């Protein structure tokens, strides 16, 4: 192979890797001048069409006379060839360094990938951590406490409802007792009115009795005066009285009878009045005693009801305070449980994000590993191509360049240049593709044959 073919291949390799081409002073004009004067070999496999055209041009014999041999041009060509050779060696050394760095990076990424795969397998295979068990146990205990508090709350609500029913019943009894008390007070007012009426009647009867007694006294006095007058008149006229007594009925007996009748009537009236008054007073006293006893019992019941109402009110207030405290405690516990659950959810979310991040990192490492494998295979292909090119170049450079000048000096005319021998090299390249599907690695392998052409 010619050095121009090697130069075109190295340039294409530098374009593949993104490096800047190395400037060379070996221009096309110098190659043309060299081929025109010395009949240099045709270019390599960089372009088959150009090489064939170059063969056609170089197939015509070029005769160079001894007089026109330009040693300065040969020396310039040798110097340019040495410069190109040194540049190619530097480029090859740089490519080798880059390839070594790529190899190191690929090994490092393979190690990281193996570590990540091991960690993922361990994370998948191992049981849930102790922290999750502790969290679940704590949540179960908190749920049990919440259920107990709910049961206590229901029990307290039932007791509160029972106390409310008892309070309503006691209020109803209180209302009934109040109505009874009002009825008793109304009856007492009526009885007092009856007592007042009876008192007035008694006073009126007493006045009547007094008036009757006064009348009886007056009648007694009148009767005594009449008796005295009669006695005086009788003593003054005894004979006449005796005569009149014989003629008229006995006045004394008549007065005695009248007096006895009046006394009987008065005593009867007094006795009847006293009996009526006593019976009425006894009835009123019994009614007053009954009413006072009922009133006293009503007052006692009312006081007892008041005491029960006060005790029940205090108990209800205490239960209300306890209920409010339990409600506040339950609310605080619910808020605390909500905050803890939110913290657990945040922790779970953070762990899931971390796992997702690790999966993304692993996928990225796998993609980088795949890209590096592709670059490695491309580098292997280009290194093989370089190796073939270098082998052909070294075999071609084995003949010293100064033989060209001696050959030109000895022969009057340059011989025809035979067409270069084309070599075909086939190489089987194994392409291994590693993909990640649903967290699992899928490895696919394909083989591809590549052919490379060269000239010797």
Swiss-Prot record:
SUPFAM superfamilies: Intermediate filament protein, coiled coil region. InterPro entries: IF_conserved, IF_rod_dom, Intermed_filament_DNA-bd, Intermediate_filament, Keratin_I. SMART domains: Filament (SM01391). It is found in: Cytoplasm, Cytoskeleton; Cell projection, Axon; Perikaryon. Residues 16-55 have a biased composition (Low complexity). Residues 1-14 have a biased composition (Polar residues). Class-III neuronal intermediate filament protein. My form an independent structural network without the involvement of other neurofilaments or may cooperate with other neuronal intermediate filament proteins to form a filamentous network. It comes from Xenopus laevis. The keyword Phosphoprotein applies. This is Peripherin. Forms homodimers (in vitro). Homopolymerizes into a filamentous network (in vitro). One of its GO terms (biological process) is intermediate filament organization. Residues 124-134 are annotated as: Linker 1. GO terms for molecular function: structural constituent of cytoskeleton. Its main location: cytoplasm. Residues 396-456 are annotated as: Tail. Residues 135-230 are annotated as: Coil 1B. Signal peptide: none annotated. Belongs to the intermediate filament family.
């Amino acid at each position: 192979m010619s050095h121009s073919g090697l130069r075109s291949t190295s340039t294409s390799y530098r374009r593949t890797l993104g490096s800047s081409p190395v400037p060379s002073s070996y221009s096309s004009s110098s190659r043309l001048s060299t081929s025109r004067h010395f009949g240099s070999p045709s270019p390599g496999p960089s372009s088959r069409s150009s090489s064939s055209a170059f063969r056609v041009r170089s197939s015509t014999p070029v005769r160079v006379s001894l007089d026109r041999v330009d040693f300065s041009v040969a020396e310039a060509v040798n110097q340019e060839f040495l410069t190109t050779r040194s540049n190619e060696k530097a480029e090859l050394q740089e490519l080798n360094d880059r390839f070594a760095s790529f190899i190191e990076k690929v090994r490092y990424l393979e190690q990281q990938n193996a570590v990540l795969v091991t960690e993922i397998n361990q994370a998948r295979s191992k049981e849930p951590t102790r922290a999750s068990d502790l969290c679940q146990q704590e949540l179960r205990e908190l749920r049990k406490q919440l259920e107990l508090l709910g049961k206590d709350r229901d029990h307290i609500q039932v007791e509160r409802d029972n106390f409310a029913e008892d309070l309503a019943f006691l209020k109803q009894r209180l209302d009934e007792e109040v109505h009874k008390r009002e009825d008793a007070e109304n009856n007492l007012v009526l009885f007092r009115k009856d007592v007042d009426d009876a008192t007035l009647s008694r006073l009126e009867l007493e006045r009547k009795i007094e008036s009757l007694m006064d009348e009886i006294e007056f009648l007694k006095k009148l009767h005594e005066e009449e008796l005295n007058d009669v006695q005086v008149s009788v003593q003054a006229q005894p004979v006449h009285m005796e005569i009149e007594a014989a003629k008229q009925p006995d006045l004394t007996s008549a007065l005695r009878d009248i007096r006895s009748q009046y006394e009987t009537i008065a005593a009867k009236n007094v006795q009847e009045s006293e009996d009526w008054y006593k019976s009425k007073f006894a009835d009123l006293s019994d009614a007053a005693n009954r009413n006072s006893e009922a009133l006293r019992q009503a007052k006692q019941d009312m006081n007892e009801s008041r005491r029960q109402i006060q005790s029940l009110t205090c108990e209800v207030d205490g239960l209300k305070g306890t209920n409010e405290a339990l409600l506040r405690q339950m609310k605080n516990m619910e808020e605390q449980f909500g905050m803890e659950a939110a913290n657990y959810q945040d922790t779970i979310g953070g762990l899931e994000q971390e796992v997702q991040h690790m999966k993304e990192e692993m996928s990225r490492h796998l993609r980088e590993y795949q890209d590096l494998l592709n670059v490695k295979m491309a580098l292997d292909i280009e290194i093989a191509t370089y190796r073939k090119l270098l082998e052909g170049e070294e075999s071609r450079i084995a003949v010293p360049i100064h033989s060209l000048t001696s050959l030109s000096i000895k022969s009057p005319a340059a011989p025809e240049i035979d067409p270069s021998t084309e070599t075909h090299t086939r190489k089987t390249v194994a392409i291994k593709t590693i993909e990640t599907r649903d967290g699992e690695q899928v490895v696919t392998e394909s083989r591809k044959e590549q052919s490379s052409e060269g000239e010797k």
